[in-house]
């Protein structure tokens, strides 16, 4: 398992600095919400990557990542038995992918992550509706943040965050 830091208050020790709401969504492949918005406490100085890893672990989800929770963290894949069962790219999104000659790829039944379905896919995250173009280990949550972790098939263009300037919609 990858290493990450868990910040935990002890008797009379540190109290949570606040809480955030985190959801995990895969509408781009027709799976909707994988994990509904869940309130998670965080501690002073804790990076979002540690908060997300704690949520994944407590929710029974597996993960693969690059880097670690304190630096260079990238969420590569989220896993659970049959996580991609019933996945289907919506027809209107498929039309956009075909129009740009997006290179399609296969996927694993138990994992959803980078290079699944397309060679431009991966997990992106948003804080309070804004796409964050920095790794989760570079973001320190604020009390009340609403965080959406979303699966994109084309560098964010399909989830309202086209990293190359293209935004097709919001699946």
Locate the predicted segments by residue.
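Ubiquitin-like/PB1-type beta-grasp interaction modules and other compact soluble beta-rich domains
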Residues: 1-171
């Amino acid at each position: 398992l990858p290493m990450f830091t868990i910040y935990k208050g002890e008797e009379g020790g540190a109290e949570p600095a606040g809480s955030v709401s985190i959801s995990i969504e895969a509408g781009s492949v027709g799976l909707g919400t994988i994990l509904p918005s869940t309130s998670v406490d965080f501690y002073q100085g804790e990076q979002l990557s540690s908060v997300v890893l704690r949520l994944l672990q407590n929710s029974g989800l597996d993960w693969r990542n690059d880097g670690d929770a304190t630096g260079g963290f990238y969420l590569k894949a989220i896993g659970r038995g049959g996580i991609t069962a019933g996945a289907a790219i919506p027809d209107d999104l498929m039309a956009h992918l075909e129009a740009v000659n997006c290179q399609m790829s296969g996927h694993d039944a138990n994992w959803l992550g980078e290079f699944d379905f397309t060679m431009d896919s991966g997990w992106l995250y948003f804080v309070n509706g804004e796409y964050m173009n920095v790794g989760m280990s570079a973001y320190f949550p604020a009390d009340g943040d609403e965080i959406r972790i979303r699966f994109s098939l084309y560098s964010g263009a399909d989830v309202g965050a086209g990293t190359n300037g293209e935004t097709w919609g919001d699946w």
